Amino acid sequence: MIEFDNLTYLHGKPQGTGLLKANPEDFVVVEDLGFEPDGEGEHILVRILKNGCNTRFVADALAKFLKIHAREVSFAGQKDKHAVTEQWLCARVPGKEMPDLSAFQLEGCQVLEYARHKRKLRLGALKGNAFTLVLREVSNRDDVEQRLIDICVKGVPNYFGAQRFGIGGSNLQGALRWAQTNTPVRDRNKRSFWLSAARSALFNQIVAERLKKADVNQVVDGDALQLAGRGSWFVATTEEVAELQRRVNDKELMITAALPGSGEWGTQREALAFEQAAVAAETELQALLVREKVEAARRAMLLYPQQLSWNWWDDVTVEIRFWLPAGSFATSVVRELINTTGDYAHIAE
């Protein structure tokens, strides 16, 4: 298995170095649900600004304030503790009057707005996130500048970030031990983390191998192509390759890579043979995913940060802004810009 730090770069290994997250204010995340609260219903959506608090801790504190069980407070995704983040929490309060949430007090947190909503906010039910990052102590400004320009055109690999695999790769190591021993794992959280790490590592490996090709974004026979921004996909045939390539070049279509698991992976012929060869040595992880009935899926191979802009405060400090769809990693963008000091693994997804 390729170590995360050794995964293939789309733009070559960065020449410069820099510091990511010198302080929480250098990593700002604003959640984008993609919809507005209904204004009625038995749930309350609460938009929180937080600094120095993890999502679960704030959710539990909100439940205590509302005098409801912790399981009645949900959220679309975990946000990093060591960052400034805006996100929505959802509390189910059937039959109760609208509480005064301006009275909710928690160090490092501020209620920005709240409103009634008809449905529970479920994990993953967000459109994306807007990021504002500050990179400090940057060396080789010219290289970073050129990479930002190139990323606007060619994107970055859509790798799962190091945080998916746990500190020191602990989640992936857990998955490997589970695969090798076949010992039942009772802890639901561990099961989820380990299976996710296993599938993500296999995806990363397939993408890393594809990026070694001279023409990375070239459609091959049997590729599974996805409409940009959509989850559905279809298989490319030899007769269609030229037209499909034009649509890929226009970013209308995205080439996908496998999230291996049980069932068919989605690619056929040449593309399927390539993907299978890329992870052929990882028989234990593949068998684990099949045994635990984790269904195979597809994910775009490349990621195009939207609304990408940047501003150099001085020759060694740059502020970068961009928007990413749900499930994508800001650290996968930063990885193509600089060799960072510090460990990505502690950054929440």
UniProtKB/Swiss-Prot annotation:
Keywords: Isomerase, tRNA processing
Positions annotated as active site in the UniProt record: 80
Biological process (GO), any one: tRNA pseudouridine synthesis
Disulphide bonds in the chain: none
Positions that bind substrate: 27, 129, 329
Top EC class, one word: isomerase
Stored Gene3D superfamilies: TruD, catalytic domain, TruD, insertion domain
Gene Ontology cellular-component terms listed: cytosol
Documented EC number(s): 5.4.99.27
Boundaries of every TRUD domain copy: 155-303
Primary role: Responsible for synthesis of pseudouridine from uracil-13 in transfer RNAs.
Family: Belongs to the pseudouridine synthase TruD family.
Protein name: tRNA pseudouridine synthase D
Organism for this UniProt entry: Escherichia coli (strain SMS-3-5 / SECEC)
